[in-house]
């Protein structure tokens, strides 16, 4: 089936739903395709304490449900489907979905987000949200005066470790190589911090913990040379081996940086294609917060409205 719309929003995290709320209130009758993971990364986040407007801790899935209902109540058409292919060569832009529909859109707001890269071991999945995290800013507070392990060796790992010293008693970085890839200035700060220690030439073999209540108690790490396995006690494990934006759909059609994040014009959400906007983590490799994603979703909506009214 072919469907036409003034505004098509791809993605249903804080950026996409914020864009939907604003475009719906502007009477643009947006259609939002919610994607393979409706609600985005917050749907796998347990406690949220840093989203403005809530004096008490809220659950990530609950917060996304509220945004979803708000977007729907103001007139957004939300479609349970996912995008398989796009054609941004001319307007109206064409978007093809898994359900076999074709959407012809006068403007598109891309909110497909980014995903943390994970180790890919079963125990990591088991304890995700119960001691295993990929966001120190989001979850560091829960490990006050505890011992934490950070996995990685680039800028992300060093920055996460430095941040976590604001909360933890001790932070141990486990890195598979014998040196960091992080910037020299970050390494200097790390080595001067008495709360941080480094275990070189090791990888995480298994994350261990308790089921009642579900919580992390340590990690088994393996020496990459000797294959010897040892146990490192900790209460939390932060995976910091990078993020990957969900931009594969747009390769070759829109300008991206070397890490495949969509490039937007400074201070805006405008992309290299007129009429196509990008909001949230898909164009933000620095902050990656729910509140900043929602903010750029609002920006994209206002810019799309202005574009359509030209």
UniProtKB/Swiss-Prot annotation:
Reaction catalysed by this enzyme: [thioredoxin]-dithiol + NADP(+) = [thioredoxin]-disulfide + NADPH + H(+)
Enzyme class, first EC level, given as a word: oxidoreductase
Enzyme Commission designation: 1.8.1.9
Keywords, in A-Z order: Cytoplasm, Disulfide bond, FAD, Flavoprotein, NADP, Oxidoreductase, Redox-active center
GO cellular component, one term: cytoplasm
Record-listed FAD binding positions: 34-41, 281-290
Cofactor note: Binds 1 FAD per subunit.
Cofactor(s) needed for function: FAD
BP GO annotations: removal of superoxide radicals
Cysteine pairings via disulfide bonds: 135-138
UniProt xrefs under Gene3D superfamilies: FAD/NAD(P)-binding domain
GO molecular function: thioredoxin-disulfide reductase (NADPH) activity
Subcellular location: Cytoplasm
Further remarks about this protein from its record: The active site is a redox-active disulfide bond.
PANTHER family named in the record: THIOREDOXIN REDUCTASE 1-RELATED-RELATED (PTHR48105)
Subunit structure: Homodimer.
UniProt family annotation: Belongs to the class-II pyridine nucleotide-disulfide oxidoreductase family.
NCBIfam families, per database record: TRX_reduct (TIGR01292)
Protein name as it appears in the record: Thioredoxin reductase
Source species: Rickettsia conorii (strain ATCC VR-613 / Malish 7)
């Amino acid at each position: 089936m072919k469907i036409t719309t003034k505004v098509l929003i791809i993605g249903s995290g804080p950026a996409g739903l914020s864009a939907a709320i604003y475009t719906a209130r502007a009477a643009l009758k947006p259609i939002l395709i919610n994607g393979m993971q409706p609600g985005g990364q917050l749907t796998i986040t347990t406690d949220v304490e840093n989203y403005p407007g809530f004096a008490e801790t809220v659950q990530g899935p609950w917060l996304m449900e509220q945004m979803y209902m708000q977007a729907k109540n103001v007139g957004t058409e939300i479609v349970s489907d996912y995008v398989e292919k796009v054609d941004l060569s001319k307007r109206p832009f064409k978007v093809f979905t898994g359900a076999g529909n074709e959407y012809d859109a006068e403007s598109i707001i891309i909110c497909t987000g980014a995903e943390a890269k994970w180790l890919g071991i079963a125990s990591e999945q088991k304890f995700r949200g119960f001691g295993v995290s990929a966001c120190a800013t989001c979850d560091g507070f829960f490990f006050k005066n505890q011992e934490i392990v950070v996995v990685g060796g680039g800028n992300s790992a060093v920055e996460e470790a430095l941040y976590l010293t604001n909360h933890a008693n001790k932070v141990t970085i486990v890195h598979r190589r014998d040196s960091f890839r992080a910037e020299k200035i970050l390494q200097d700060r790390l080595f001067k911090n008495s709360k941080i220690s480094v275990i070189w030439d090791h990888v995480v073999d298994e994350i261990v913990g308790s089921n009642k209540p579900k919580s992390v108690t340590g990690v088994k790490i393996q020496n990459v040379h000797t294959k010897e396995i040892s146990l490192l006690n900790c209460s939390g494990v932060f995976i910091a081996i990078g993020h990957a934006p969900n931009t594969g759909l747009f390769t070759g059609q829109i300008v991206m940086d070397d890490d495949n994040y969509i490039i937007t014009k400074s201070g805006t959400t405008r992309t290299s294609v007129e009429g196509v906007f990008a909001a949230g983590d898909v164009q933000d490799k620095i902050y990656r917060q729910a509140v900043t994603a929602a903010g750029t979703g609002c920006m994209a909506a206002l810019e799309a409205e202005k574009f359509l009214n030209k």
